[in-house]
Amino acid sequence: MCPQRQFQSFTTTAESTLSHTTHKQLSGATIYDEPENFLEIEVCNPKTHFPSGDAKGMYTDYEIICRTNLPGFSKRSSSVRRRYSDFELFRKLLIKELQLSNHPKVSVQHLPGKILLSNRFSDAVIEERRQGLNKWLASVAGHPLLQTGSKVLVRFIQDPTFQG
């Protein structure tokens, strides 16, 4: 379980674009209904691994939890684990996908920087990176064109065997 159950939710409903005055006129049941289209995503639960029993092979991965009802996603809820290098590959493939699909105006931000310090496995550093990756993925997943048209985004968020 993620320590803070605070999903980033992105809706693409007509109701989400209504004015404040119109919103007040909606019934209580309508206001609290599930949005027509939504994508909730969170990067959480970092876990450090020691595959060879020594510090040389150590790495940290992060759980990505997703809930959605967008038609392009095959699963309504999913949980996968990703390393920082997976995020790097995802960003590279996403930029390539955007260029090929003629959407060069969609800007993909840089990832939070690589950590090259000896304390990169400290709890504070890992939490800082988790927060940075969560913010970065929220900005990517929150883009309407990527929510509805990126096959790379869907694979990264939902395919446990994501290899690019």
UniProtKB/Swiss-Prot annotation:
SMART domains for the chain: PX
Top-level taxon: Eukaryota
Keywords: Cytoplasm, Golgi apparatus, Lipid-binding, Membrane, Protein transport, Transport
CC terms in the record's Gene Ontology section: early endosome membrane; Golgi membrane; retromer complex
Gene3D superfamilies: Phox-like domain
UniProt GO MF annotations: phosphatidylinositol-3-phosphate binding
Membrane topology designation: Peripheral membrane protein
Coiled coil: none
Binding site for a 1,2-diacyl-sn-glycero-3-phospho-(1D-myo-inositol-3-phosphate): R83, S85, K114, R120, R129
SUPFAM superfamilies referenced in this protein's UniProt entry, alphabetically: PX domain
Family: Belongs to the sorting nexin family.
Function noted in UniProt: Required for retention of late Golgi membrane proteins. Component of the retrieval machinery that functions by direct interaction with the cytosolic tails of certain TGN membrane proteins during the sorting/budding process at the prevacuolar compartment. Binds phosphatidylinositol 3-phosphate (PtdIns(P3)).
Name under which the protein is recorded: Sorting nexin-3
Record organism: Kluyveromyces lactis (strain ATCC 8585 / CBS 2359 / DSM 70799 / NBRC 1267 / NRRL Y-1140 / WM37) (Yeast)
Gene: SNX3
